[in-house]
Amino acid sequence: MEVEGKGGEAGTTTTTAPRRFALPVDAENKATTFRLFSVAKPHMRAFHLSWFQFFCCFVSTFAAPPLLPVIRENLNLTATDIGNAGIASVSGAVFARIVMGTACDLFGPRLASAALTLSTAPAVYFTAGIKSPIGFIMVRFFAGFSLATFVSTQFWMSSMFSGPVVGSANGIAAGWGNLGGGATQLIMPIVFSLIRNMGATKFTAWRIAFFIPGLFQTLSAFAVLLFGQDLPDGDYWAMHKSGEREKDDVGKVISNGIKNYRGWITALAYGYCFGVELTIDNIIAEYFFDRFHLKLQTAGIIAASFGLANFFARPGGGIFSDFMSRRFGMRGRLWAWWIVQTSGGVLCACLGQISSLTVSIIVMLVFSVFVQAACGLTFGVVPFISRRSLGVVSGMTGAGGNVGAVLTQLIFFKGSTYTRETGITLMGVMSIACSLPICLIYFPQWGGMFCGPSSKKVTEEDYYLAEWNDEEKEKNLHIGSQKFAETSISERGRATTTHPQT
């Protein structure tokens, strides 16, 4: 599979540099094509390392839900304990994702992600030794920190791939990483059964099973450290040491990010697409097990089908975002995002009202495609909000996903205030409501859903260089933003790039 940006018609300059890179690159040495089956360094190797590391972290974080019927019996977990554990698994990553964004801006995605992955792996191993509900909640909380590798994944892809294909790269990397949420629904029951067949009791088997995701999480971190590279031109630490890359002012990086209102809207909307996905990962196996009286492995297979849709749904969202951009520019990306996320919310609301097992499975599968595609569409927009504070904006958006999951589980799925069916329906309504602010995102150089570009003829260079003051420009600290502005002309769309703004 190869995705190629239409550089000529979008204003993106593509160059080929066979001596340095296997893929054609732009002025920032970002790849202008995406070759899925290549492992060429640095672009495609970074892609495969990032999605696999994120996949392993997702498997570890959600390894418990498919075994909950056994775990709750062993630890005497109440409905409140299970709800609190689900909330804990996604709440830790709220702070971690914000910090990860800043860490990527300052130290690079390679070191930042590997450090987090290694530091959270012990929580997965320690799950084998817990003896109380409090212990269960704590290990899920600390293991959930690893979900912040999502931010480093998106940052890394945005650093390696040019605008016309960045949506595809982000969507596929995140989608295949999120696939871990579905894969673990299959992996853990199978591992549990294998250990049981070797003679272990069920209360021992589930504990031993947690060493498998912990081991793979650890190995993925070492692979990133050994084989990864932060940027097309090298690693952050080496470029800082040689003077090729100046260290940015952390205060200004954070300030620019949080002052950009667009980042807050992407965080809100992402809270009710990815947040919904995280919530479903936590509740869906138990939901089908209890409501339709299924066997543990059968419920696990059905639940797995939701997460496994990430194999194509989220990548499809990213690819669709790039397609709409080539035809209609940034405005096309925004419209596609809103339509898909709203449709996902409608399907989610319907799911909670269906009492037939067969129809529930069908609606859940269609719903999974839309909600996961909406996640991919979100990160088709995020890379263009800020060049200087990309990590901060990515972190804010990613954290928004976890905040949405925490609030949803706290309000609708903690205790017995709502039935699971009612909670799922209300979650869908919230998703529809939180997609509405997407219409408020406006770029003066490109426009928004309902408005065209500013009458003041603001250019891409005006927008991205506004993040730097005159003193910083005199030191040439803005060069990266200037190059990014040149390649971002593609976001004007096919209808306007033939008549560039002046």
From Swiss-Prot:
InterPro entries documented for this protein: MFS, MFS_trans_sf, NO3_transporter
Disruption phenotype: Loss of plant growth and root system architecture responses to the rhizospheric Phyllobacterium. Decreased nitrate uptake in the high-affinity range.
GO biological process assignments: nitrate assimilation
Induction: Down-regulated by nitrate and by imbibition. No induction by growth on low nitrate concentration, but strong induction in mutant with disruption in both NRT2.1 and NRT2.2. However, this overexpression could not restore the nitrate influx. Induced under long-term nitrogen starvation. Strongly up-regulated upon inoculation with the plant growth-promoting rhizobacteria Phyllobacterium.
Annotated localization: Cell membrane
Alphabetical UniProt keywords: Cell membrane, Membrane, Nitrate assimilation, Transmembrane, Transmembrane helix
Tissue specificity field: Expressed in roots, shoots and seeds. Expressed in leaves. Expressed in root hair zone of the primary root and the lateral roots, but not in the lateral root tip or in older parts of the roots. Detected mainly in the epidermis and the cortex. Expressed in shoots only in higher-order veins.
Tagged with keyword Lipid metabolism: no
Membrane topology: Multi-pass membrane protein
Organism superkingdom: Eukaryota
One MF annotation (Gene Ontology) recorded for this entry: nitrate transmembrane transporter activity
Keyword Cell membrane: yes
Any one GO CC term of the record: plasma membrane
Stated family: Belongs to the major facilitator superfamily. Nitrate/nitrite porter (TC 2.A.1.8) family.
Binding partners and assembly: Oligomeric molecular complex with NRT3.1.
Function text: Nitrate transporter involved in the constitutive high-affinity transport system (cHATS) under long-term N starvation conditions. Predominantly expressed in roots of nitrate-deprived plants as a 150 kDa molecular complex with NRT3.1 representing the major contributor to cHATS influx. The principal role of this cHATS is to enable roots previously deprived of nitrate to absorb this ion and initiate induction of nitrate-inducible genes. Not involved in transfer of nitrate from roots to shoots.
Protein name: High affinity nitrate transporter 2.5
Gene name linked to the record: NRT2.5
